[in-house]
Amino acid sequence: MTQLIAGVDEVGRGPLVGDVVTAAVILDPAKPIAGLADSKKISEKKRLALFDIIMQNALAVCVGRASPQEIDELNILHATMLAMKRAVQGLATQPTFVRVDGNRCPNWDYASEAVVKGDSLFAEISAASIIAKVTRDAEMSELHNAHPEYGFAQHKGYPTKAHLEKLAELGPLSQYRMSFKPVQLSLMQRGGQLAGN
């Protein structure tokens, strides 16, 4: 029997806002995809093109996520592991083996290995990194459209100087991760009031 190998990667552990997004992808060995690489090392235009190619040609793709509330409750590491579990369990075709980018695998029953810099080494992890990044970036663009004053389209929720200044000025929205230090600080300075309240 052919091994069905799923690649798993996450995006969005560092941002102050939004879900942590993971993707699991099983590529079709009969349909190799040229140009797969770590999503951080390719242009947005190429990422979007590869996203469509992966969605059309992969044997199975699933996005798993953990919400800001789950991140606050569990911590970012455990929330990321939960999101990865959701991504793999949601695959329409279940894998015989799972490769996870990073240095640890979730606690699950799948045969698996963690691969540091796996998004540069294995096509299935590269594909997962592209699916996760494009998905999360699109969500940040939607949040930007709803709240352009925060500049989410530029910083994608990461704690840049410009973002921290806007957070201090405007306060956190309900989509922020309240357990993250800069968000806690902003909330304290506002007497616990979210933006718009």
Curated annotation (Swiss-Prot):
Residues 3-192 form the RNase H type-2 domain. It is an enzyme of class 3 (hydrolase). GO terms for molecular function: manganese ion binding; RNA binding; RNA-DNA hybrid ribonuclease activity. Its cofactor is Mn(2+); Mg(2+). Its EC number is 3.1.26.4. It is found in: Cytoplasm. It comes from the Bacteria. CDD domains: RNase_HII_bacteria_HII_like (cd07182). It catalyses: Endonucleolytic cleavage to 5'-phosphomonoester. GO terms for biological process: DNA replication, removal of RNA primer; mismatch repair. PROSITE patterns: RNASE_H_2. Endonuclease that specifically degrades the RNA of RNA-DNA hybrids. Belongs to the RNase HII family. This is Ribonuclease HII. The lineage of its organism: Bacteria, Pseudomonadati, Pseudomonadota, Gammaproteobacteria, Alteromonadales.
